[in-house]
Amino acid sequence: MKFLDHEKRRQLLNERHSCKMFDSHYEFSSTELEEIAEIARLSPSSYNTQPWHFVMVTNKDLKKQIAAHSYFNEEMIKSASALMVVCSLKPSELLPTSHYMQNLYPESYKVRVIPSFAQMLGVRFNHSMQKLESYILEQCYIAVGQICMGVSLMGLDSCIIGGFDPLKVGEILEERINKPKIVCLIALGKRVAEASKKSRKSKVDAITWL
């Protein structure tokens, strides 16, 4: 397996940015879409619970409908080649006895993981469904980070979107999937202009070495 050298890794980390406008003429190939979907599917999660569902929107009319309920992100979404809707599972679906959890793992893995997960729910969350919901959202955002970095490795661009009306977008999607619980949107495509220079805190302010 070949890995990127130090300079290439540094370049990619610096070039990744939140793209605010995409090349509206750029269309993803089926290979690119499949690769993005696989990047999402292979995202890590605590206990390998994978408490998410990803909806890839490439239909222009549907994307336009969603964009209309995204406030100041409307033009950016319309210019994107695709829009990923990141949805979370319900807390009840992550209970150890749920159909989802009982069918998620191979039997040899399940007998080890389910008891440990059940113990964690009691010790860490005191069986609070609200805390379990927060845990699920944490896992979804881990996936979001992987997706955006993975897309950058493909030479493509992305923007995480929290500014939208989840009820309105949910109503649009309900015609196709059952009652989605939307965490965020990710606009995907090819940048139309070069990114501005990345601005970050200094290493001294951001990192403590012990």
UniProtKB/Swiss-Prot annotation:
Q: Where along this sequence does the record place binding of NADP(+)?
A: 150-155
CDD domains associated with the record: NfsB-like (cd02149)
- What is the protein's known function? Reduction of a variety of nitroaromatic compounds using NADPH as source of reducing equivalents; two electrons are transferred.
Which principal EC class is assigned to this enzyme?
Answer: oxidoreductase
Q: Does the keyword Transcription regulation apply?
A: no
Question: Superkingdom of the source?
Answer: Bacteria
Q: Output the InterPro entries linked to this UniProt entry.
A: NfsB-like, Nitroreductase, Nitroreductase-like
**Molecular function via GO:** oxidoreductase activity
Q: What is this protein called?
A: Oxygen-insensitive NADPH nitroreductase
Q: Where is the signal peptide?
A: none
